[in-house]
C-alpha cells in the first residue's frame, strides 16, 4: 500500500488495479475495496491527489512513505492496556496482513479467497494451472465485512488486547 499510485484506483468500481510489474508474482491484481477504504482514499485525494503516490513523505516530494515511517507510526500508537506507546516488537505495517489473514480465517472466509486478496501465489502448480477463479463478488463482500468488523471494534471499544510480541 505504500507504493499505491493514484492511477491504479478506480473509484467508480471501488477497486485497485495493480499491474503485473508491481507484484512479486508478476500477475496483475484487482483489489476490491470496502466503502470505508474508498472514503479514506477520497479524503487523501485532497492531500496528495496531485502526486503520483497516494501516501507520500511529509517533505513535499513525490516519494512514497518508507517502511520505517509506517512502522514508527504504529509503534507510537497507544496501547489501550498500558496507556503507553506500543514501542518496537509488537507490530509492523506488514503485520496487518498477517492479522487480517488470521482474523478472516477465524471469521470463516475460505482461505483461497483470502490468499487471492493478499496476492499470494498458489503453491500447488497443477491447481494454479487449472483454477483461474477470481471470486470477485466474494472478495468484495469479504472486504466490506472486514471493514465493518473493524469499525465495530473501533466504535464499541470492544478490542481484546494481545499481549504477545509478533515474531
Regions inferred by a protein language model and the residue ranges of each:
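Active-site-proximal structural scaffolding
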Residues: 2, 9-11, 24-26, 34, ...
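Generic secondary-structure boundary/loop-capping signal
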Residues: 3-6, 20, 52, 62, ...
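C-terminal secondary-structure termini that scaffold catalytic or DNA-interacting sites
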Residues: 35-39, 43, 47-51, 56-62, ...
